Amino acid sequence: MLISKGNPMLMGCSRYKDGYNFTYESECENAALLIFDAHMKPKERIELDSSMKCGNIFSVHVSGRRLDTCFYCYEIDGLMYLDPYAKAITDCGRFGQTDEKDVYLAAIDVADYDWEDDRPLNYDYSDCIFYKMNVRGFTKSRTSKVKDKGTFSGIINKIPYLKELGITTIELQPAYEFDEIGRFPQLTDTIMSKYGAGTHYSVDKNTRKINYWGYVGGFYFAPKASYSSIASKHPGVFRDYTVEFKNVVKELHRNGIEVVMEMFFTDESTGFILQCVRHWVTEYHIDGVHVYCDESALKALSQDALLADTKIITVYWNGKTGTKKHMANYNNDFQNIARRLLKGDEN
């Protein structure tokens, strides 16, 4: 195995120059990259010091060995931390449940995907009819008549129903790896510590109430594992579940339906938010995002050339836009009034 200084511009883990580039932000002077084999057993430990640091970013390049099926995390002061840029995470397949045997690690690589000729649909807002859904709640009911209830695959089973409704766009409530049960203490308790996000050995019995809706911090670059039939059917065994989300997007697009994701950010930096949205647009072909973030991040999203065709929806946009109207305000007042009318509420 060959170890050298990496490219600090590539956050997270990525294939790079016949090897793998690992980059991690931390204010610590020293850290360690821990690599685990396909069975999640310790494989390599790589010390990170000031020679591999630029500003607050550690970066290391690893080559000479195939690591595609391996996992990783970082160790700082004896604690193990997940990468905030993790693309897929182990042992998160059971919604609202944890086990003392769970080990939370990030997958080094995810499978290549054949998108065929798929691309975002880019409907004008004036032509859109939105349908907002919670992935789990949409098909979890016994009456849903789908095979994989409460999962991304369940949405595919309901495409004929969605088309019958006449909708053009589905909006997914948080479907990234949000922390619904407090399995990542560092993340849940401090949002984002100066050392990183999340520790992998949370062994105390969890007494937190389940956050069903997902408006909480999380690992924003990874799909929600427990929303995947692949991960939920095989707890304790990692299988690349990212393909399931991609299947959903491709099949919805094939049937003329856009996909917009809700993303609830807390105190994440503008750069992090921009990279996150770019990731979902390029890696998962989503058509847009409904974001909760501060004004500086929103402005950066609105001006990003890569996102010029991507729907960016918020609750307080009053700025300028380009030749294509891709920015929009979310009108909750109309939604709430319409819901009360349909339900027959008195107020």
Give each language-model segment a name.
Residues E25-A31:
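Short proline/glycine-enriched turn/loop motifs at strand-loop junctions of beta-rich domains
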Residues C276-R278, T282-N347:
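Active-site-proximal helices and loops of the catalytic beta/alpha 8
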Residues S144-T151, G182-R254, F265-E283:
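Aromatic- and acidic-residue-enriched carbohydrate-binding clefts of CAZyme catalytic domains
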Residues A107-F178, R183, N211-G214, F219:
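An acidic-aromatic substrate-binding cleft motif
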Residues M1-G19, K43, M52-K132, T139-V146:
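The feature marks proteins involved in alpha-glucan
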Residues I129-Y131, I170-L172, V259-M261, V289, ...:
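Hydrophobic faces of well-ordered beta-strands that scaffold small-molecule active sites
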Residues H39-E47:
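Surface-exposed loop/edge segments in extracytoplasmic proteins
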Residues Y24, Y74, M133, L162, ...:
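Conserved, mostly hydrophobic/aromatic
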